C-alpha cells in the first residue's frame, strides 16, 4: 500500500465529512 494513496483517500473522506 502506498502512503500517498491512503492519505489521499483519507483526505477525500475528510473533505466529504467536513461538508
Curated annotation (Swiss-Prot):
<keyword id="KW-0467">Mast cell degranulation</keyword>
<keyword id="KW-0964">Secreted</keyword>
<dbReference type="GO" id="GO:0042742">
    <property type="term" value="P:defense response to bacterium"/>
</dbReference>
<dbReference type="GO" id="GO:0050832">
    <property type="term" value="P:defense response to fungus"/>
</dbReference>
<dbReference type="GO" id="GO:0005576">
    <property type="term" value="C:extracellular region"/>
</dbReference>
<comment type="function">
    <text>Mast cell degranulating peptide. May also display antibacterial and antifungal activities. Its mast cell degranulation activity may be related to the activation of G-protein coupled receptors in mast cells as well as interaction with other proteins located in cell endosomal membranes in the mast cells.</text>
</comment>
<protein>
    <recommendedName>
        <fullName>Bombolitin-8</fullName>
    </recommendedName>
</protein>
<keyword id="KW-1213">G-protein coupled receptor impairing toxin</keyword>
<dbReference type="GO" id="GO:0045087">
    <property type="term" value="P:innate immune response"/>
</dbReference>
<keyword id="KW-0399">Innate immunity</keyword>
<keyword id="KW-0295">Fungicide</keyword>
<comment type="similarity">
    <text>Belongs to the MCD family. Bombolitin subfamily.</text>
</comment>
<keyword id="KW-0044">Antibiotic</keyword>
<dbReference type="GO" id="GO:0090729">
    <property type="term" value="F:toxin activity"/>
</dbReference>
<keyword id="KW-0391">Immunity</keyword>
<keyword id="KW-0929">Antimicrobial</keyword>
<keyword id="KW-0800">Toxin</keyword>
<dbReference type="GO" id="GO:0031640">
    <property type="term" value="P:killing of cells of another organism"/>
</dbReference>
Amino acid at each position: 500500500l502506498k502512503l500517498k494513496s491512503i492519505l489521499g483517500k483519507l483526505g477525500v473522506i475528510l473533505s466529504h465529512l467536513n461538508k
